[in-house]
């Protein structure tokens, strides 16, 4: 069934069941809750659809509706309403006066949006953003909360059943060149099926599905859209949404919502697990229990084994089951999901000899190993999405334990980027494997840009190809370096290289607090921190640090999904725009 036919079925068979709930914290009048049943949601969706259908059709292309609105139920109605009208929705961030506003404006321009859907609250900012960053000032901007309820059903169900039915998911990387991944409804339904098969333990032949979903992830992000919209829609359970800002202001809210709802499914990036551990008090959790939690995905950025260990230890007194926490791997080019740990099993990790990893092959650490790297263990089988390790230069499939690029094959994989050069899309999305193993299709394969290796039915991720740091001919993975630095600084870290006359130099930038208090440092500590970090990187990694910066909290540039952007850090460093809290001799 398509997304919209599933929604209409829910509105018909369970019209009064709660569908979407939005928790709006910290408003001027206190916390507020906005609720919609399935029938109410369908009415809102058809109101949006009726308005868009009134614009008519383009003869040669599908109309696009960019959505740039605050997190909430209007965002949900806007996305589904565009699909319902046979349009292509384009989920984007709400303009908030930050660097990401440029990305939003450029995306509106790139997708040639016929309209921009927003709310009355954000309308002025949206108009200013699209005018400033090159989109036509005549592009209609529609406040979703002002649309009248329609009479009759205004959904174009025929368009939902064709491969033409699609949306654009802009990746969270480059601000200067946002890329819209073209995703069909077939891609989505395949990925939902893959998620159900791989995340939920099967009992008696049926998956143990969640009874609710809890999400604070932004709906414009690939994981936020899957967890906050597609999963509850296809599973048929209520979703409790809140905003990323509400989580950041009080991370304990995430755990409290999980405790208060039945068998919940949820997801967040690795940094959120660290925040939940650091910022959730005993008072916050008083009287609460997490023993009923179905699944918590850790994804969207490199999963750190230490984070998983600390998270499980912190919430063990509240009966959180280790098997409920699921380290995961995915990307927007494949909707979102690619792999996770084995269903029903707790997350595990393995220690490898770091020197062998630097030389391009994996060897287990032993008592003689001088330096070990611990990596999360993911499960790999012969079901889609298929995963293989390939030499990125020769396109030859690599054997067990050899480090190469991770390639993906499956019906959830996009056909390419919108408005991209044909050669780029062929190289990225239609790659062919040479000397493929038995049972391995020759093509098409998605080049992920990630490095990893396979051992048996397990695979491991070591980092991004573009972030690889090479010093004295040896490969070093920034995640490994950053983990070492965090042991001394406590905050977020970026390890990146800069080139000077063809020579690569390692730079470390670490966020620290300067006030007194737990996990904070004083000015007198800075030189000590630098000495310890430089010494550790030399002894443990064999690395020479050219420059070491301590910067204020929040100073390191991030992508729209909250990940540290090493490329942006390097660019700001080169322009001398990274703010330092201390200068070292």
Swiss-Prot record:
Hydrolase found in the keyword field: no
CDD domains: FAAL
GO cellular component, one term: plasma membrane
Keyword annotations: ATP-binding, Fatty acid metabolism, Ligase, Lipid metabolism, Nucleotide-binding
Transmembrane segments: none
Record has Membrane as a keyword: no
Pathway terms, separated by semicolons: Lipid metabolism; fatty acid biosynthesis
A Pfam family that the UniProt record links to this protein: AMP-dom_DIP2-like
GO biological process, one term: fatty acid biosynthetic process
Entry EC no(s): 6.2.1.-
Top EC category: ligase
Molecular function GO labels: adenylyltransferase activity; ATP binding; ligase activity
Protein family per UniProt: Belongs to the ATP-dependent AMP-binding enzyme family.
Described purpose of this protein according to its UniProt entry: Catalyzes the activation of long-chain fatty acids as acyl-adenylates (acyl-AMP), which are then transferred to a multifunctional polyketide synthase (PKS) for further chain extension.
Protein name: Probable long-chain-fatty-acid--AMP ligase FadD30
């Amino acid at each position: 069934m398509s997304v919209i036919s599933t929604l209409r079925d829910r509105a018909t068979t369970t019209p009064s069941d709660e569908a979407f709930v939005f928790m709006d914290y910290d408003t001027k009048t206190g916390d507020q809750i906005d609720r919609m049943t399935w029938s109410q949601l369908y009415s809102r969706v058809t109101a949006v659809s009726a308005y868009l259908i009134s614009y008519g059709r383009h003869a040669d292309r599908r109309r696009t509706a960019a959505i740039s609105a605050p997190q909430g139920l209007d965002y949900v109605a806007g996305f589904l309403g565009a699909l319902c009208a046979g349009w292509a929705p384009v989920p984007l961030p709400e303009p908030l006066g930050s660097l990401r506003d440029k990305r939003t404006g450029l995306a509106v321009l790139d997708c040639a949006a016929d309209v921009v859907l927003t709310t009355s609250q954000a309308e002025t900012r949206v108009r200013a953003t699209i005018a400033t960053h090159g989109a036509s000032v005549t592009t209609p901007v529609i406040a979703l909360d002002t649309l009248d309820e329609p009479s009759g059903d205004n959904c174009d169900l025929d368009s939902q059943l064709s491969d033409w039915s699609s949306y654009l998911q802009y990746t969270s990387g480059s601000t200067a060149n946002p890329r819209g991944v073209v995703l069909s409804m077939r891609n989505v339904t395949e990925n939902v099926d893959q998620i159900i098969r791989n995340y939920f333990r099967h009992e008696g032949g049926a998956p143990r599905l969640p009874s609710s979903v809890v999400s604070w992830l932004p709906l414009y992000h690939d994981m936020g859209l899957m967890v906050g919209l597609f999963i509850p829609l296809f599973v048929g359970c209520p979703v409790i949404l809140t905003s990323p800002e509400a989580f950041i202001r009080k991370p304990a809210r995430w755990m409290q919502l999980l405790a208060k709802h039945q068998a919940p499914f949820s997801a967040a990036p690795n940094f959120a697990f660290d925040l939940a551990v650091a910022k959730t008090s005993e008072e916050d959790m008083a009287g609460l229990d997490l023993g009923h939690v179905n699944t918590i995905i850790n994804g969207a950025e490199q999963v750190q084994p230490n984070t998983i260990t600390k998270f499980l230890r912190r919430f063990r007194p509240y009966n959180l089951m280790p098997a409920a926490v699921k380290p995961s791997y995915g990307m927007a080019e494949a909707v979102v999901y690619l792999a996770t740990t084995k269903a029903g099993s707790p997350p595990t990790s393995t220690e490898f000899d770091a020197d062998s990893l630097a030389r391009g092959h994996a060897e287990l650490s032993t008592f003689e190993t001088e330096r070990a790297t611990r990596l999360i263990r993911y499960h790999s089988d012969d079901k889609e999405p298929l995963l293989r390790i390939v030499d990125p230069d020769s396109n030859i499939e690599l054997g067990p334990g050899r480090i190469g690029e991770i390639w993906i094959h499956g019906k959830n994989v996009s056909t390419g980027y919108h408005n991209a050069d044909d050669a780029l899309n062929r190289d990225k999305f239609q790659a062919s494997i040479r000397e493929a193993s038995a049972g391995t299709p020759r093509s098409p394969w998605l080049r992920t840009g990630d490095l990893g290796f396979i051992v048996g039915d397990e695979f491991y991720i070591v980092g991004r190809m573009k972030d690889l740091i090479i010093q004295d001919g040896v490969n070093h993975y920034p995640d490994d370096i950053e983990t070492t630095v965090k042991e001394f600084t406590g905050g977020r870290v970026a390890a990146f290289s800069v080139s000077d006359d063809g020579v690569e130099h390692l730079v470390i930038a670490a966020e620290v607090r300067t006030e007194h208090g737990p996990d904070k440092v004083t000015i007198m500590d800075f030189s000590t921190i630098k000495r310890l970090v430089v010494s550790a990187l030399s002894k443990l990694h064999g690395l020479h640090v050219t420059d070491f910066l301590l910067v204020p909290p929040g100073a390191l540039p991030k992508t729209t999904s909250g990940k540290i952007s090493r490329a942006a850090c390097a660019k700001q460093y080169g322009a001398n725009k990274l703010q330092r809290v201390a200068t070292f001799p």
